[in-house]
A protein has these predicted regions:
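Structured non-transmembrane domains adjacent to transmembrane bundles in polytopic membrane proteins
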Residues: 74, 79-287, 370
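Membrane-embedded transmembrane helical bundles of large multi-pass transporters/channels
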Residues: 1-79, 209-415
């Protein structure tokens, strides 16, 4: 937000002042590029060709976009782990060796935190009796290796702490304070698996009936909570973003159809990138070439990619629609307006897209999986948006809608 706000303020204040000060000198030290000054009507000719047979172009393009996006229906999400690092990284190799050779010492641990009421003495046989039942239930859960803690042994509390066995006394002294106690549950399931998520849910079910507040922590618990949070908030966020976007586009072109079409087109380009990152990073299509281990996508990848890619797509869309709308106001001819608008904005959008693709493609060679996948997804989203969507889907769809593109419900007035 701050970066966009800063760029906006710069473009409205400092940039015009600099351009005014430099004047014609802005063209000094130009780099001679062959054919740079040659005028071309490529975008006008191509869009006119598309609009002569809009259905023939639109249906295959839409089918391709839907096909590219369909793998996202099988997406798997995770909070990440050591698999996010390159297979040849020393730290990952060391951990994998330890897991293979000493599984008991590298078992995944789910910490349980018992929060005591103010003034409540944790050294209580009553609390231990209740916790014994809970601990026994947790031990029966599939995937639990062990759960050992003196707070689960009410028989110890008939004696003084000094009389306890050394192991129990040391564990009590290092994991219990006046306000909380921590119990480690060793499990065979690592984070990022369906089994680990089910294990967390089963543990929480066992602790629900306790008179004490018992919190289930750990990386797997964080993953379960993040997925739940995202599933709860994403519908609201999507609704807000899409509605606000349509309102802003409507304020620019005063049309109902065009904003809806703009949002749908951008969703198609973003969904195509979502589908391809599933094929590449989850299914492992380019795992050898890009040096990574196929795995579920990081939880943060889809929200981040959607936010950035949708914003860029709308930026290109608004730029193009503003030119088309200007031509429509001048000519009243929808087909001519579309071809004129694409010709006026096509080169600018293509150049901007090429720059963004080059920038995002550099992220693909990063070592960390989340950066690699985000860079790939954004590069694909921009490429699809600047080619299939802008060159084919938009002109063919607007040609089919005709003058209905510019209808507005403002008392039946034309946009």
């Amino acid at each position: 937000f701050l970066a966009v706000l800063g760029a906006l303020m710069y473009s409205l204040t400092l940039l015009p002042a600099l351009l005014s000060y430099l004047g014609p000198r802005i063209n000094s030290l130009r780099v001679p590029i062959p054919g740079a000054n040659r005028k071309t009507r490529f975008w006008e000719k191509f869009s006119t060709k598309v609009m002569k047979n809009p259905v023939r172009w639109l249906l295959p393009a839409m089918a391709l976009l839907l096909l590219l996006g369909s793998p996202f229906l099988n997406v798997q999400l995770t909070a990440g782990g050591v698999e996010a690092l390159p297979p040849d990284l020393e730290s990952r190799q060391a951990l994998e060796i330890l897991e293979d050779e000493f599984p008991a010492f590298t078992a995944s641990v789910v910490p349980l935190v018992i929060v005591f009421d103010d003034g409540q003495d944790p050294y209580s046989q009553e609390i231990a009796s209740e916790m014994e039942t809970i601990c026994e239930g947790i031990r029966e859960i599939q995937g639990v290796i062990s759960l050992e803690h003196p707070i689960c042994k009410p028989g110890l509390f008939v004696t003084e702490l000094e009389e306890w066995p050394d192991n129990d006394r040391l564990l009590w002294q290092t994991t219990v304070s006046q306000n909380i106690a921590m119990i480690d549950v060793a499990t065979i399931f690592g984070s990022g698996t369906d089994e680990s998520e089910q294990l967390i849910k089963d543990i929480r079910t066992q602790t629900e009936g306790s008179t004490q507040e018992i919190l289930v922590g750990g990386w797997s618990s964080f993953e379960v909570d993040m997925k739940q949070h995202l599933s709860d908030r994403i519908p609201f966020v999507l609704t807000f973003v899409l509605l606000l976007t349509m309102v802003l586009v409507w304020m620019q072109v005063r049309s109902i159809v065009v904003p809806v079409k703009a949002v749908l087109m951008n969703i198609l380009s973003v969904s195509a990138s979502f589908g391809l990152i599933v094929v590449v990073f989850q299914e492992g299509l380019l795992s050898d070439a890009l040096n990574f281990t196929p795995q579920p996508l990081d939880l943060m990848v889809p929200p981040l990619v959607f936010g950035i890619a949708f914003g860029l797509s709308m930026d290109y869309e608004v730029l193009m629609l503003s030119r088309i709308h200007e031509a429509w106001n001048e000519t009243g001819d929808n087909t001519l307006a579309v071809s004129t608008g694409l010709q006026a904005s096509g080169s600018l959008i293509t150049g901007a897209a090429a720059i963004m693709i080059a920038v995002f493609s550099g992220f693909i060679f990063a070592d960390v999986m989340i950066i690699k996948s985000i860079g790939f997804a954004l590069a694909i989203a921009v490429f699809v948006d600047a080619t299939i969507v802008r060159a084919i889907v938009v002109p063919s769809a607007m040609r089919l809608m005709g003058k209905a593109n510019w209808w507005s419900p403002n008392f039946g007035k034309k946009a």
